Design a protein with these regions (language model features):
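A domain-start/cap signature at the N-terminus of enzymes
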Residues: 2-132, 158, 198, 228-244, ...
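Short beta-strand/loop motif that positions the catalytic acidic residue
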Residues: 11, 274-276
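Acidic catalytic loop of the alpha/beta-hydrolase fold
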Residues: 17-18, 60, 279-284, 290, ...
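Short alpha-helix in the alpha/beta-hydrolase fold that links the catalytic acid
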Residues: 19-27, 147-149, 283-302, 312-315, ...
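Extracytoplasmic/secreted proteins, especially bacterial periplasmic and envelope-associated proteins
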Residues: 22, 26, 65, 69-73, ...
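Gly/Ser-rich "nucleophile elbow"/oxyanion-hole loop immediately N-terminal to the catalytic nucleophile
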Residues: 121-128, 184-232
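Short substrate-entry loop that stabilizes the transition state in hydrolases
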Residues: 123-176, 249, 261-262, 282-284
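Active-site-adjacent mobile loop/cap segments within catalytic or ligand-binding domains
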Residues: 344-358
Length: 388
C-alpha cells in the first residue's frame, strides 16, 4: 500500500489552492509508518517517518534556481529494488567527506582495475588490525552503487571493518544474459562468470586484489578477510569459492545468486552463508533438483564435507542439522560432526531480487564475525573452535 513504501516528496505550488491542498492531504495520509521505514530506510528513518512538511515561498518555475532546488531535493535519495516488500531507500553519500579512497592498479594479466576502500574514521592510522569485507556488485551496477545501497558502511563504523568494493569491467553482454542475444553490440558492467574463455580472469583479479590490499594497507587482518556479493556478485562469490583463491578467505556469504561457473581447485573447508528470495530470479526451493540454486547448494555441501556426490541430493533435501524460521528468514543449517555450521541457507519471505541492508547485518553478526582463519595452517575456527 502507499503507506508501506517510503517516498520522499517535495511539492512546489505558488499558492495553496484546493487542488494543491488535496495533493498535500494525499501524501499526509500516506505518511510512512514506523515499521515500514525501519525495514526500507535504515538510515534517516525518523525523517522519512515524519509528517508531511510544507513551506511557503515564491518560485518562478522558469528559473534555473527552481530546477536546482528540486534536483537538490530529489538527488539526495537513492532507491534500490522494485518490490513493495524488498526495496531500500538511502541517501547519496559524499565520498570525500566520508574518506572513501578510490584505488586503481594493473593486474598481472595487464588489465586495469579499480576498487574503492572505506576505513571508518575512528580506525584510520590507528595501526589496529581490521577485518576486511570484499563486496562484489551485481550485473550492470558498480562499486559505487553497491557501496551506497548496501549500507555496509554503517556496519563498518559500528564494528570496525575495512570495506573493499571492486569494480567489474565493461564487456559485451553474453547471449545468456538479457539483451545479449538481441543486441550483440551491447556492453554492460559484468563479472566474467558467464564466459568460459574469460571467467578465470576475474579469479586472477581477486588474487591480485588481495595482494594489493595487503601491500597497501598494513591494517588488513589476513585471518579475517571475507567475501560477499549480490546477484552476479553472489555468482562471483560461488565461483571464487570453488577456486584456490578461496583459501585466503575466512568465510563467504552472499545474496540472491546461483551457481554460474566453478573450478575444482578449492580444497579447504570454507564456511558459506547463502540467501535467496521468495520472489527471486531463480527458485529458492531446495526440493527442486538441478536448478542453478540447488547446484550452488550441492557444490558447497560437497565442498565442505557435508555430503558427497552420491548422497548430496538427499543431504540437501533432508540432511540439514537444523531448520528454523526467524522473522523473514527461513533457515537451513548443515553442521559438521563437531556441531560447527559450515553451510547455511536462508530464503527470505516477501523479498524480490535485491540486497537488503538487514541481510548484510545478518551476514556480519551471525557469520563473518564468528569465523577466523589461521593463515599458516589454513585451518578456520568458529567462535574459537577449530574446524577439523
Amino acid at each position: 500500500t502507499r503507506k508501506e513504501v517510503p517516498v520522499p516528496v517535495k511539492i512546489v505550488e505558488s499558492t495553496m489552492t484546493e487542488q494543491a491542498k488535496a495533493v498535500a492531504d494525499y501524501w499526509q495520509a500516506a505518511a510512512n509508518d514506523k515499521n515500514a521505514v525501519e525495514r526500507f530506510a535504515p538510515e534517516g528513518g525518523e525523517i522519512l517517518a515524519a509528517a508531511v512538511v510544507t513551506e511557503e515561498g515564491n518560485y518562478d518555475y522558469a528559473l534555473p534556481a527552481t530546477t536546482d532546488m528540486i534536483w537538490d531535493f530529489m538527488g539526495q535519495f537513492y532507491r534500490y529494488g522494485g518490490g513493495v516488500l524488498s526495496n531500500a531507500i538511502s541517501w547519496k553519500v559524499d565520498y570525500e567527506e566520508m574518506g572513501v579512497e578510490f584505488r586503481s592498479f594493473t593486474d598481472s594479466q595487464g588489465i586495469d582495475r579499480q576498487y574503492l576502500v572505506y576505513i571508518p574514521e575512528a580506525y584510520r592510522g590507528s595501526g589496529e588490525q581490521l577485518p576486511v569485507v570484499i563486496a562484489y556488485h551485481g550485473a550492470s551496477t558498480s562499486m559505487r552503487n553497491f557501496f551506497e545501497n548496501t549500507l555496509w558502511y554503517n556496519i563498518a563504523d559500528e564494528e570496525g571493518i575495512m570495506l573493499v568494493f571492486p569494480e567489474s569491467t565493461l564487456v559485451p553482454v553474453p547471449p545468456t544474459l538479457g539483451g545479449g542475444e538481441a543486441n550483440p553490440t551491447a556492453y554492460r558492467a559484468l563479472w566474467q562468470v558467464e564466459d568460459p574463455e574469460l571467467r578465470y580472469t576475474d579469479v586472477v583479479y581477486a588474487e591480485d586484489l588481495l595482494d594489493q590490499l595487503i601491500a597497501v594497507y598494513p591494517q588488513v587482518d589476513q585471518g579475517r578477510i571475507y567475501c560477499t556479493g549480490h546477484s552476479m556478485g553472489c555468482m562471483m562469490t560461488h565461483y571464487l569459492g570453488s577456486a584456490e583463491v578461496s583459501h585466503r578467505f575466512a568465510a563467504m556469504g552472499a545474496t540472491s545468486g546461483p551457481l554460474m561457473a566453478r573450478e575444482e581447485t578449492g580444497s579447504q573447508t570454507v564456511p558459506m552463508f547463502m540467501t535467496m528470495a521468495q520472489y527471486d530470479m531463480w527458485s529458492y526451493d531446495l526440493n527442486q533438483d538441478d536448478t542453478m540454486t540447488t547446484q550452488a547448494v550441492d557444490m558447497w555441501l560437497v565442498r565442505n564435507g557435508l555430503a558427497d556426490a552420491s548422497n548430496v541430493v538427499e543431504g540437501r533435501k533432508t540432511g540439514a542439522t537444523e531448520t528454523y524460521v526467524e522473522g523473514r528468514y527461513n533457515n537451513s543449517v548443515w553442521e559438521n560432526e563437531d556441531g560447527i555450521p559450515l553451510f547455511r541457507y536462508a530464503w527470505v519471505t516477501g523479498k524480490d531480487h535485491v540486497n537488503l541492508p538487514a541481510e548484510n547485518q545478518l551476514l556480519w553478526d551471525e557469520w563473518f564475525s564468528q569465523i577466523t582463519l589461521d593463515t599458516e595452517t589454513g585451518v578456520r575456527a568458529y567462535q574459537g573452535q577449530a574446524i577439523g
